[in-house]
């Protein structure tokens, strides 16, 4: 099984710990970045994880940022992605078994590495339990998806990154 994983600069260490854990379990890890602690933007890496899952390069995805909120919102904008921001086992299993979540998101500064690893392991092993009700709910969610014209362009964020480099945006 292939697992795509991505993060922002705030939780690179946590992502690497999770990546090492997944590899130790025999999973192939597709590291979508970021790879260091240089200030960056979580939407880039959420998009990369989402695209890896949506296009079939990865079976499932893991997204991590400081609180998990930003990167989880970003990954959910990719068509075909159903990501759940979780902090506990019950929510993660519900997301997979009832809503067929294909990405799981975490706040790396909220949830500890060991708990993240336990939750991810259970999430991967859980199976979607298809029912008529679940199918109807997923169809309604899929109906909400919209595709932006240039969204699949790998340079989609360049305009915003150029503005950042010029100092147009501030933290």
From Swiss-Prot:
- Can you supply a Gene Ontology BP term from the record? D-allose catabolic process
Q: Which domain of life is it from?
A: Bacteria
- List membrane-spanning regions: none
According to its UniProt record, the EC number is: 5.3.1.26
* Keyword entries, A-Z: Isomerase, Lactose metabolism
Name any one GO molecular function: galactose-6-phosphate isomerase activity
Q: In which pathway does it act?
A: Carbohydrate metabolism; D-galactose 6-phosphate degradation; D-tagatose 6-phosphate from D-galactose 6-phosphate: step 1/1
A Pfam family that the UniProt record links to this protein: LacAB_rpiB
Q: Which cysteines are joined by disulfide bonds?
A: none
Q: Which reaction does it catalyse?
A: aldehydo-D-galactose 6-phosphate = keto-D-tagatose 6-phosphate
The record, for HAMAP family, names: LacB
Q: How does it assemble?
A: Heteromultimeric protein consisting of LacA and LacB.
PANTHER family on file: DNA DAMAGE-REPAIR_TOLERATION PROTEIN DRT102, RIBOSE-5-PHOSPHATE ISOMERASE B
Q: Which NCBIfam families match?
A: lacB, PRK05571.1, PRK08622.1, PRK12615.1, rpiB_lacA_lacB
Question: Which family is this sequence assigned to?
Answer: Belongs to the LacAB/RpiB family.
Question: What protein name is recorded for this chain?
Answer: Galactose-6-phosphate isomerase subunit LacB
Source organism (scientific name): Streptococcus equi subsp. zooepidemicus (strain MGCS10565)
């Amino acid at each position: 099984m292939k697992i795509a994983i991505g993060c922002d600069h705030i939780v690179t260490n946590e992502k690497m710990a999770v990546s090492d854990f997944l590899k130790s379990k025999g999973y192939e890890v597709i590291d979508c970045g970021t790879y260091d602690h240089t200030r960056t933007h979580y939407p880039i890496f959420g998009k990369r994880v989402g695209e890896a899952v949506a296009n079939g390069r990865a079976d499932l995805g893991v997204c991590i940022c400081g609180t998990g909120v930003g990167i989880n919102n970003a990954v959910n904008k990719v068509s075909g992605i159903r990501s759940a921001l979780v902090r506990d086992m019950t929510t993660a299993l519900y997301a997979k078994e009832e809503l067929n979540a294909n990405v799981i998101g975490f706040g790396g500064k909220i949830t500890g590495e060991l708990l993240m690893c336990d939750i991810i392991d259970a999430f991967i092993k859980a199976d979607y339990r298809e029912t008529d009700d679940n199918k109807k709910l997923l169809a309604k969610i899929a109906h909400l998806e919209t595709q932006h014209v240039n969204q699949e362009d790998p340079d989609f964020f360049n305009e915003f990154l150029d503005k950042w480099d010029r100092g147009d945006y501030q933290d």
